Amino acid sequence: MVLLGAGMSLMHAGTEDKDSLVVVFWNLENFFDYIDDGTGESDKEFSSTGMRRWTKKRFYTKCDAVAKSLLWMGDRYGRMPDIVGLAEIENKGVLNKLLRNTLLRKYDYEIIHHESGDRRGIDVAILYRRSSMHPENISLKVPYYEGKKLATRDILHAEMVLADGCKVDIIVNHHPSKFGGEEISKSRRDAAMTSLKELCDSLSSDTVIAMGDFNDTPDSPSFKIIDGTLTNMAAPLYERGDGTIRYEGKWDLIDMFLVSPELEERTRMEICRIPFLMTRESRHPGDKPFRTYSGPRYIGGVSDHCPIVLCFFRGNSYI
């Protein structure tokens, strides 16, 4: 099942046009390699000798499923994704293995990644197609709270120059979770959202596409911080009851695209429920994302998040 945003079938909206872009965001849920290189508890946990028994075979099974998913999107939209924003990535080496050892090696993807100060050792990253664009400027925005750097993911920004010379600013986020309680953690998510607004204000750009796992739903107060700066393309989907994660039979929408107001009429967001990424709920009717582990037990899926897609229809003299 595939959910469509804004009442428009993206499949028939001309996404194969050379003047359009297909942008994906996906939280890959603990995308670690199988080697314990001594960089933290999560690195040890997700290793061949760790508690999860995260072996080379299991790692490459996940890599193959990620590649298959992107190829599925390529079939659906008439072109492989031009930009893929990712969350919960251990390091650049994981992405190199993904691109070199799966069917993605046939495509010209390049990596933008920087290590962050996240306490779990996970980062955000960008994959982009070299034939479609190149980065002109890359920067990080570090969220601060009460004068101290948050031990969370940095916000990754890349100013991308498209093949025709036009520019678009890509921003990838993974805001602090609700671990420890929603109210206790709210101030940290507010701080991350404030950092996002500060970054956007510094760009003086009207072609911003921000994406990420915001660990908040579109009606959360934190999104008021960016009112007037970015438009939340996920809001109509959320109002319909759609979501990207599912808990106790209920969908929640925490993965989103936020765009410059000038782009709102030329972009559409979709939640991808790719059949082989879904599994039946055991206690509730319906499907849920097929994750890699159920508690400590390996079950062979990819992530507890559905990927999301933004189709960006540039048109004549659009940017």
Go through the PLM ranges and name each one:
Residues I83, I89-K167:
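Structured beta-strand-rich core segments of catalytic domains in phosphoester-bond hydrolases
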Residues A13, E198-V208, D216-I319:
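Metal-dependent phosphoester-hydrolase catalytic domains
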Residues T49-F59, M80-L86, H113-H114, Y144-E146, ...:
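Second-shell loop/turn segments in exported
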Residues E16-V23, F32, S132-H134, A151-P176, ...:
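Beta-strand-turn-beta hairpins that frame and shape the catalytic cleft
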Residues H113, L156-Y238:
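Extracytoplasmic, non-cytosolic globular domains
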Residues L28-F31, I89, H175, D213-F214, ...:
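Active-site metal-binding loops of divalent metal-dependent hydrolases
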Residues M11-T102, I112-S116, I122, T194, ...:
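N-terminal, active-site-proximal structural segment of metallo-dependent hydrolase catalytic domains
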Residues N91-G93, R119-G121, K178-G180, N215-P221, ...:
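Active-site environment of divalent metal-dependent phosphoester hydrolases
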